[in-house]
Amino acid sequence: MPKRQDIHKILVIGSGPIIIGQAAEFDYSGTQACLALREEGYEVVLVNSNPATIMTDTEIADRVYIEPLTVEFVSQILRKELPDAILPTIGGQIGLNLAMKLSNTGILDELGIELLGTKLTAIDQAEDRELFKNLMQKLHEPVPESAIANNIEEAQQFADKIGFPVIIRPAFTMGGTGGGIANNEKELAEIAENGLNLSPVTQVLVERSIAGYKEVEFEVMRDAADSAIVVCNMENFDPVGVHTGDSMVFAPTQTLTDKEVQMLRDAALKIIRALKIEGGCNVQFALDRNSFKYYVIEVNPRVSRSSALASKATGYPIAKMAAKIAVGLHLDEIKNPVTKKTWAEFEPALDYVVTKLPRFPFDKFENGDRTLGTQMKATGEVMAIGRTLEESLLKAVRSLEVGLIHPERPAFAKLSDDELSKQIIQANDERLFYLAEAFRRDYTIEEVAELSKMNPFFLDKIKHIVELERELAAHKADLGLLAEVKRYGFADEEIAKLWGLHADQVRQMRKEQKILPVYKMVDTCAGEFASDTPYYYSTYESSTESVKSDKPSVLVIGSGPIRIGQGVEFDYATVHSVKAIQKAGYEAIIMNSNPETVSTDFSIADKLYFEPLTLEDVLNVIDLEQPEGVIVQFGGQTAINLAEPLANRGIKILGTSVEDLNRAEDRDLFDQVIKSLKLPQPEGGTATDKAGALAVADKIGYPVLVRPSYVLGGRAMEIVHDATELDNYIDRAVSVSHDHPVLIDHYLVGKECEVDCISDGDTVVLPGIMEHIERAGIHSGDSMAVYPPQTFSQDIIDQITDATIKLSRTLNCIGLMNVQFIIHDGKAYVIEVNPRASRTVPFLSKVTNIKLAQVATLAILGLSLKEQGFETGLLPNQSGIHVKSPVFSFSKLNHVDSLLGPEMKSTGEVMGSDTTLAKALYKAFEAAGMHLPQFGRALITVKDADKAEATALAKRFREVGYQLVATSGTAKAFEKAGITVSTIEKLDSGQETILEDIANRKIQLVINTMSADKKVSSDGFRIREAAIEHGVPLMTSLDTAGAILKVLELQAFSISPIKS
C-alpha cells in the first residue's frame, strides 16, 4: 500500500530527559523517525523537553517545541498546531504514557487526531499487566503464574499462595522502574509499595520467579499488510532476574539450537500479529536451559533500548522503518538504505558477534547498592563487534572506560576464596571481572556455573581468555601466539604487560610482522549482496573492506558511553562537528563505541568506525585513513585524554594545541596564566601527598574545595571543612588520578556562572552567559542555569567578558572553551577553564540560535570567525528567558545520597522557556517531573549555618499557604521569627515520625541541608532517601527552594483582610 495521503501534519513526541532506563537511544530513534517522515513529504512537528538532543535541532522537524512533556503543555501545542496524527512510539515509555493520557482526556477525539503505528488497544494490551496476561493465555503462549495487585495486601495474598521468591513488575513503567525480586514478606511490602507508587495506573504484576532461565530477546517488525520479520535476536549473559539493560548482551543468540530459535521466532511473530502492532516491537522470553519450556516475560510495543542496539548490531534502521510503516508503507515497498538493493522485508543476517556491555554510575556513587536485579541501574552502554565472541567481548571491555583494557581488576586478586565466591553468587556490576578472577585461581567451569548460575558456554569463553593470558606469560615474544591472541581481541597493552614490554613495542612488533587489523563492513546481509555502507569494525583477518578515500579527511573522536558527567551533550557536539567538516569539503570520519547515539548512525558521517576509544584502536584507524588531523574537543574527557598520547606519536591535533590544553588543565601552569593576566582567582595550591595537602589547606584556610586534576563531572570533588575531613578525603580519592596532583582551593561563597566561547586564535565570541541558581559548591552540571543572567550588573558582565577574552587569547584557544566564575564581593573570580566543548553547548546553541560546535569546527579548519560574520565580544541577548534544569535518577539507585555538592549526580537535563523567569522556572520544574502542589506541609530541616536564610524562605512558604514542619533546632529559629511551625522529633531521638509522615504522604515538600556532623548527616541521608523513595519533591539547596517559591508565588493570588 502506498503511503497515506489523508494525513499531512504529524506530531512526534520525544522522550524527555535522560534518566536511568531511558537514555540517548531515543534521541537516535526520534531523529531517524522525524527525518524519515519528512523524506516522505509529511510536515513534522516535534515536542520534547530535552535541549541536549539532535532531535530538537530546528532542521530535524518543520517546527520544534522544547516544552514539558505533560498533558497541559502538549494539549496546548495540539490546539495550536492541529496535527492530523501523533506518532507516540519513538518517545520511549514517556511518549507512550503521554499518548494514553491525552487520549483519556478526550482531546484526540475532540480535535480528530489519530495515533499512528501502534493503536491504543495494543499499547494497553502490552503495557497493562492483566490485559497482557489474558492475551497470552488466549494465544496459548506461556506466561509465569501471576496475579495483578492494586495494593500491598493483594500482592501479599498471591505471594503467600505460591511461595517466595516472587518478581514484582509495575505497569506502564520503563527500565524495570519500581520492580524487583522479593524473597520474603518484608521485601515484598517495600518493593510493592514502591512499584505501586511509580506505576501511573497504581498496578503491579506479582509473578512466580523464573530467575535462572536464559533471557532471550527478539526485535520484530510488522506492517499493515501483516508482513512480519525478525530483525535481530539477542541473548543475555545474565539469566532472568537481572534487567536486560544491566546485562551483557550478545547478538545473534549464542547458545540456542535452531529448534529453539525457530520456536521463539514463531512465538514473537505470533505476538506482534495478535497485538496488531504496526512498526517495531521487542519481545522478551525466558527459556529453560534443560528443556524446550519457555515463558513470555514482556513486550515493548515501541522502539526501545534494545531496538537501538539491534539497529546498530545489524545496520537495519528500525526507527526509520517503523516511522515509514506508521504512515502506511509496507515492508516490501521500503528500500533497505544499507544495501540500497534489497527491500526492508529481508531479514538481516550477521557474520560476526556483537557484545553490549552496560556502563554503571558507581564510580560516582561509591556507597550505592551494586546488586543487580529487575530494576535497571546502568546509565549507558557500549557495543563492540568481532569475529569471535572473545574478540567482541574484550573490545567491549576496553570500550567501557572504567580504567581497564582487560577483564582484570588487580584488587580482586587480594580477595579470599570465600569473598570471591560471594561476589560470584550475587549479580553485580563487576561480575565479569570476578568470574575471570575465579578462572585465574583454577576454579572449574562446573564450580563457577554452580555458583553463578551462568551458562557454561559463556564461562568457557571467559576461561579461554584466561588461558590465553597464561600462554602469553609463558611464551614471551612468540609471534605466532601474538597473531592468535590478536584474533581473540587482546589489546597491545595487555600483551605488553604480560611480556614486560611497552605497548608501543608490541605495536611495532605487530607492524613488522604484518599482524594488522582489517576493517569489515556492517551490511545487514552477511556479504550476500553488494553494499556501500560506510560502517566498519576491526578484526584480525586477511582482507579489508575499508579503503582510504582520495578526498582529504578529518577524524572526530566521539565520547563513548553515556555516564554521569559525560552525557548526550557531547554526542550532540560531535554530530555538529561532523556536519561542519562536511560543509568545509572534507570527508568526516567518526570513531565511537556507543550504540545509543546519533553519532553512530551510519548515515551521519562519511565513515563510521565502531571501535573502542583507546590509543591502540584510534592509531589503527589513523594508519589506514591518514586523516589531515584529529578533532578531540567535542568528545568530552574521553577524547581530550587521547590528545597528548596521539600528539606524542606525531598525529596532528586540530584546534587548541596539546601544550595549551595542558596549560588549562595543569594547576601550576594555569595559575601562572591567571597571575600573568592579573585575574582574580580563589587562593589555592597543589599537592601530591597528604602532608602537602594539609599544609596547603592550613595556609589558605578552611573550608577548601579539593579535587584531582584532569577530571570531568566533578569526579571525586569535595568541600572539606577541617583537617580530619581532608585526611579522610586524601585516603579515599588521591588515587583517582595517579599521574596528577590534587588541587586545593579556598571555597568562596557566591553566585556561580559559566560562559562558552568560540575563538579562532584572534576573534573571541561569547554567545551568552549562563547564571546558576544554586550558589558555588554545587557542580555546574547539577545547577539550574538561566540565560540571560537575571541578577548581574553590567560591571560583572563586563568583567566576565573581559576575563574570558583574555583567557582565550592567552591559552591560544582555537575552537570552543568553557569558563566558570564565582561572583564574590563584586568581583568575578575564575574557578575553572575547560578548553573544549562543555555540556552547556546544546542548551546555549538552542537559546542563541547559533550552532556553537559547527562555528567552532569551521574555525578549527581555518575559516575565521570574521569570515563567518562574528566580531570579538559578548553577543546581544536573545529574546525570552530560558532555564536549564538538571534531572536525577536517584529513585533507581539504592543507598545513594541525593545531597548535591561539587561532584555531579544528574543524568540528564530539561529546558523551560518563557517571557518571565517565574514562568520559565515553572516549565523547567514540570519538565523535570517535579510537580509542586500549591499548598500542603513542607518539612524543613537545615544545618545551623542555613537557619537565617531558611527562616526568610519559611515566611514566604507560609505566605503561599504551606504549613511548616521542622526539627527542634530549625523550629526554634522559625518561632523566634514569629513563624507558625509544628515541631517533629529528630530521628536520633529514636522516633521515626518524620519517615512515617513522608511515607504516608503527610509531607508534600522536603527541604533538607546537611551538617558536617556525621550523626546528623545520617539523619539527613535517611530523610532524603525517604523523600525519593516516596516521590516527595526534595530540595537540598536553599537556592533551589527559592526558585520554587518564585513559581508558587506566581501561581498564588494575594489574599489579605481589608484594613479597619
UniProtKB/Swiss-Prot annotation:
SUPFAM superfamilies, A to Z: Carbamoyl phosphate synthetase, large subunit connection domain, Glutathione synthetase ATP-binding domain-like, Methylglyoxal synthase-like, PreATP-grasp domain
GO molecular function: ATP binding; carbamoyl-phosphate synthase (ammonia) activity; carbamoyl-phosphate synthase (glutamine-hydrolyzing) activity; metal ion binding
Biological process according to GO: 'de novo' UMP biosynthetic process; glutamine metabolic process; L-arginine biosynthetic process
Binding residues annotated for Mn(2+) 2, in chain numbering: 298, 300
Oligomerization domain, as annotated region: 402-546
UniProt remark on cofactor binding: Binds 4 Mg(2+) or Mn(2+) ions per subunit.
Chain positions recorded as Mn(2+) 3 binding sites: 820, 832
InterPro entries: ATP-grasp, ATP_grasp_subdomain_1, CarbamoylP_synth_lsu, CarbamoylP_synth_lsu_oligo, CarbamoylP_synth_lsu_oligo_sf, CbamoylP_synth_lsu-like_ATP-bd, CbamoylP_synth_lsu_CPSase_dom, MGS-like_dom
Residues that, per the record, bind Mn(2+) 1: 284, 298
Binding site for Mg(2+) 4: 832, 834
EC identifiers of the protein: 6.3.4.16, 6.3.5.5
Residues covered by the MGS-like domain: 930-1060
Pathway, per record: Amino-acid biosynthesis; L-arginine biosynthesis; carbamoyl phosphate from bicarbonate: step 1/1; Pyrimidine metabolism; UMP biosynthesis via de novo pathway; (S)-dihydroorotate from bicarbonate: step 1/3
UniProt-annotated stretches for the region Carboxyphosphate synthetic domain: 1-401
Start and end residues of each ATP-grasp domain: 133-327, 671-861
Domain notes: The large subunit is composed of 2 ATP-grasp domains that are involved in binding the 2 ATP molecules needed for carbamoyl phosphate synthesis. The N-terminal ATP-grasp domain (referred to as the carboxyphosphate synthetic component) catalyzes the ATP-dependent phosphorylation of hydrogencarbonate to carboxyphosphate and the subsequent nucleophilic attack by ammonia to form a carbamate intermediate.
Protein name (record): Carbamoyl phosphate synthase large chain
Biological source species: Lacticaseibacillus casei (strain BL23) (Lactobacillus casei)
Lineage: Bacteria, Bacillati, Bacillota, Bacilli, Lactobacillales
Gene: carB
